[in-house]
Curated annotation (Swiss-Prot):
It catalyses: IMP + diphosphate = hypoxanthine + 5-phospho-alpha-D-ribose 1-diphosphate; GMP + diphosphate = guanine + 5-phospho-alpha-D-ribose 1-diphosphate; XMP + diphosphate = xanthine + 5-phospho-alpha-D-ribose 1-diphosphate. Mg(2+) binds at D204. This is Hypoxanthine-guanine-xanthine phosphoribosyltransferase. InterPro entries: HGPRT (IPR050408), Hxn_phspho_trans (IPR005904), PRibTrfase_dom (IPR000836), PRTase-like (IPR029057). GO terms for cellular component: cytosol. Homotetramer. Keywords: Cytoplasm, Glycosyltransferase, Magnesium, Metal-binding, Nucleotide-binding, Purine salvage, Transferase. Belongs to the purine/pyrimidine phosphoribosyltransferase family. Its EC number is 2.4.2.22, 2.4.2.8. The gene is LACZ. GO terms for biological process: GMP salvage; guanine salvage; hypoxanthine metabolic process; IMP salvage; purine ribonucleoside salvage; XMP salvage. GMP binds at K77, E144, D145, I146, I147, D148, T149, G150, K151, T152, K176, D204.
Length: 231
């Protein structure tokens, strides 16, 4: 697989793990914080499964970039858990390779993006970032938590064009099977999940539930409890 450079096309992408519509686990089977439990329906993807899948994604990414230097953009805040685990595995895989390099394999950068209030997209994208002009002529991998409608990544990739980046690829932990999806595909995907609002593993509902270890479904009571006052 060549280094991807057609954001949204998902050309030559590996298949994600498919989570069926009726998949899930009883909350009592896992360690769930007591203050969250009544606001959740079920565990959709357990923490251990998420971690192992991220390790495999790191392996796939390393195979594609091989020993080419690349820069990883973390889209905060939802991607933080995925990004941290991915970097850990990429570093370990690279450190155990026999190749000597004069510089680190990858650089890391952080961009704050926000497009949701409650469980709805606001239709606008707020971007706060460091100076990304250093990415000119570089390979860039965007790390996103979830592709829902796909609108966030379309707008963000458009934003990146002014920096004259060499290649742009996308890694996302989850892609949601929703009729609202605009067709934007990632190049490295962890899981294909059903059309439900998910929280946990750094995914939030109005900044709540990020600290859940597992990917879970939030129920209507939870949405009402933590609903923002305005869109």
């Amino acid at each position: 697989m060549p280094i991807p450079n057609n954001p949204g096309a998902g050309e030559n992408a590996f298949d994600p793990v498919f989570v069926k519509d009726d998949d899930g686990y009883d909350l009592d089977s896992f360690m769930i914080p007591a203050h969250y439990k009544k606001y959740l329906t079920k565990v959709l993807v357990p923490n251990g499964v998420i971690k192992n899948r991220i390790e495999k994604l790191a392996y796939d990414i390393k195979k594609v970039y091989n020993n080419e230097e690349f820069h990883i953009l973390c889209l905060l805040k939802g991607s933080r858990g995925f990004f941290t685990a991915l970097l850990k595995h990429l570093s370990r895989i690279h450190n155990y390779s026999a190749v000597e390099m004069s510089k680190p394999l990858f650089g890391e950068h952080y961009v704050r993006v926000k497009s949701y209030c409650n469980d709805q997209s606001t239709g606008t994208l707020e971007i706060v970032s460091e100076d990304l002009s250093c990415l000119k002529g570089k390979h860039v991998l965007i790390v996103e938590d979830i592709i829902d409608t796909g609108k966030t990544l379309v707008k963000f990739c458009e934003y990146l064009k002014k920096f004259e980046i060499k290649t742009v690829a996308i890694a996302c932990l989850f892609i949601k099977r929703t009729p609202l999806w605009n067709g934007f595909k990632a190049d490295f995907v962890g899981f294909s999940i059903p059309d439900h609002f998910v929280v946990g593993y750094s995914l939030d509902y109005n900044e709540i539930f990020r600290d859940l270890d597992h990917c879970c479904l939030v129920n209507d009571e939870g949405k009402k409890k933590y609903k923002a006052t305005s869109l």
